[in-house]
Amino acid sequence: MGGMKIITTLLLLLATVAVGDKKDLPVATVHVFLKEDCPIARYHTKTLSELHEHYAKEGIAFRGYVSNRKATEQSVAAFKAKFVIPFAIEPDASLSKANLLGAKVTPEVVVRDRDGKTLYRGRIDNTYADFGKRRRVTTSHDLRDVLEALTKGEAVEPKSTEAIGCLIPVT
């Protein structure tokens, strides 16, 4: 198990280094954890697509992971097509990405800078007060606010929020 975590860490680092000079790297990468059958994750796909569309121009990259032991290339491709997800998304059937980045539920995001430092971890927004309890009005747009701060060169606050969603199985 420890070997798999080391390999995954090395692959993430190699993917970062392989791009070349740091100025060529994205300002930050939003790692998005999703599940095909999670209603809260499904709900947030539109918001994530809109954020990607807006912030990709600002140098923010998005990577999606379907953290589900049953996830396959085919199931992820079908999910991506059904919900029109514009960024790369891959199966995380081994849960190695979720374990490496500390994701516990879907949807959950982890924003890392070009050096791999975690800047933010948590919910996309506060649409859901609890599992199955959707607010009438979303009052906190956490991920959008983090990305806005990053593009303006401001400090990211808060550093984390509690994500509400479907549990990622513990390994």
Regions found by a protein language model. Give the residues of each.
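Structural recognition of the beta-strand scaffold that forms the well-ordered cores
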Residues: 29-32, 61-66, 88-91, 111, ...
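Short, internal strand/loop/helix patches
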Residues: 80-119
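Structural microenvironment flanking redox-active thiols in thiol-disulfide oxidoreductases
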Residues: 42-82, 91-100
